[in-house]
Amino acid sequence: MATIKDVAKLAGVSTTTVSHVINETRHVAEETKKIVLNAIEQLHYSPSAVARSLKVNTTKSIGMIVTTSEAPYFAEIIHAVEDHCYRQGYSLFLCNTQNNPEKIKNHLEMLAKKRVDGILVMCSEYTADSLDLMKSFSDLPMVVMDWGPVNPNTDRILDNSFEGGYLAGKHLVDNGHKEIAYLSAELKKTTARKRYEGFLKALHEAGLEMNPDWLLEGSFEPEDGYECMNRLLAQEFRPTAIFCCNDVMALGAISAITEKGFRVPEDFSVIGYDNVHISRFSAPPLTTIHQSKARLGERALQLLFERIQDKTAKRETIEIHPELVIRKSVKNLNRH
């Protein structure tokens, strides 16, 4: 593998001149520049990314720490982030944590060693350990992409889960539903709890109370939606509608409903959350709460690039508002 010394020798110049040509850190005569570039091409020389970053103070790379890249919601955001990074000439290092503090620590240390220009963080929950870890890397520009901790060292983008939960509850109430269940991820998780609180607000505005037997907790997985729905179907008294904490739980719930010989929305109305790509292809197409994954990813990167350019600027909190997407999984009881 060729070195910078080999390039300098072939071009008949100093290693300093070669460095200036590569990093564009000083004017070099056009003829000399051409000779150096020809030598680089002949030797197939590739400068060390780390060495170059020490010269120009950028690696043109971003780190992204997520709970998991398998879940459809995370996967769609990651795709949007990677696409925007590519268009801006940046590379993306993706790190999955499964909310394991040890993994978060190792990933943060690895990203710091690779001298990434900044880090995006998107975890479904933040433990005390992970918050402390993030504070210890506060010299790195960092944007938290979900509900996020209140941290003066990071910018935040809020997804307004409370507002989304309210929109879901209100849509069901407006369609004449009074007996409504909530299939939730663990309520200790902020996202699930905020969606539930917004949902309760819509019920209370309509003078309705939540039946505690119809509040079932699982996780953000289709298996949990399936199992929770089966527990609901086993009860003597059943709701007319089900609000699911996310779309994949809703798909699991619909599977349980159809297995038992019931139909959506004729027998049970179902509404999801996130508007992941597959939700429009369920049977029937799923009514859901839309969060623009492309807008979230692009806005997070814009904010991170701003922070990379100016590390001393005041930290920002930006809100992204969810929207109701009406398809065919909710029955209007007012017409019957």
Swiss-Prot record:
<feature type="binding site">
    <location>
        <position position="191"/>
    </location>
    <ligand>
        <name>hypoxanthine</name>
    </ligand>
</feature>
<dbReference type="Pfam" id="PF00532">
    <property type="entry name" value="Peripla_BP_1"/>
</dbReference>
<dbReference type="InterPro" id="IPR000843">
    <property type="entry name" value="HTH_LacI"/>
</dbReference>
<protein>
    <recommendedName>
        <fullName>HTH-type transcriptional repressor PurR</fullName>
    </recommendedName>
</protein>
<keyword id="KW-0804">Transcription</keyword>
<dbReference type="InterPro" id="IPR001761">
    <property type="entry name" value="Peripla_BP/Lac1_sug-bd_dom"/>
</dbReference>
<comment type="subunit">
    <text>Homodimer.</text>
</comment>
<comment type="pathway">
    <text>Purine metabolism; purine nucleotide biosynthesis [regulation].</text>
</comment>
<dbReference type="Pfam" id="PF00356">
    <property type="entry name" value="LacI"/>
</dbReference>
<keyword id="KW-0658">Purine biosynthesis</keyword>
<keyword id="KW-0678">Repressor</keyword>
<feature type="domain" description="HTH lacI-type">
    <location>
        <begin position="2"/>
        <end position="56"/>
    </location>
</feature>
<feature type="DNA-binding region">
    <location>
        <begin position="48"/>
        <end position="56"/>
    </location>
</feature>
<keyword id="KW-0805">Transcription regulation</keyword>
<dbReference type="InterPro" id="IPR023588">
    <property type="entry name" value="Tscrpt_reg_HTH_PurR"/>
</dbReference>
<feature type="binding site">
    <location>
        <position position="274"/>
    </location>
    <ligand>
        <name>hypoxanthine</name>
    </ligand>
</feature>
<feature type="binding site">
    <location>
        <position position="73"/>
    </location>
    <ligand>
        <name>hypoxanthine</name>
    </ligand>
</feature>
<feature type="binding site">
    <location>
        <position position="220"/>
    </location>
    <ligand>
        <name>hypoxanthine</name>
    </ligand>
</feature>
<dbReference type="InterPro" id="IPR028082">
    <property type="entry name" value="Peripla_BP_I"/>
</dbReference>
<feature type="binding site">
    <location>
        <position position="189"/>
    </location>
    <ligand>
        <name>hypoxanthine</name>
    </ligand>
</feature>
<dbReference type="GO" id="GO:0003700">
    <property type="term" value="F:DNA-binding transcription factor activity"/>
</dbReference>
<dbReference type="GO" id="GO:0045892">
    <property type="term" value="P:negative regulation of DNA-templated transcription"/>
</dbReference>
<dbReference type="GO" id="GO:0006164">
    <property type="term" value="P:purine nucleotide biosynthetic process"/>
</dbReference>
<dbReference type="GO" id="GO:0000976">
    <property type="term" value="F:transcription cis-regulatory region binding"/>
</dbReference>
<dbReference type="InterPro" id="IPR010982">
    <property type="entry name" value="Lambda_DNA-bd_dom_sf"/>
</dbReference>
<keyword id="KW-0238">DNA-binding</keyword>
<feature type="DNA-binding region" description="H-T-H motif">
    <location>
        <begin position="4"/>
        <end position="23"/>
    </location>
</feature>
<comment type="function">
    <text>Is the main repressor of the genes involved in the de novo synthesis of purine nucleotides, regulating purB, purC, purEK, purF, purHD, purL, purMN and guaBA expression. PurR is allosterically activated to bind its cognate DNA by binding the purine corepressors, hypoxanthine or guanine, thereby effecting transcription repression.</text>
</comment>
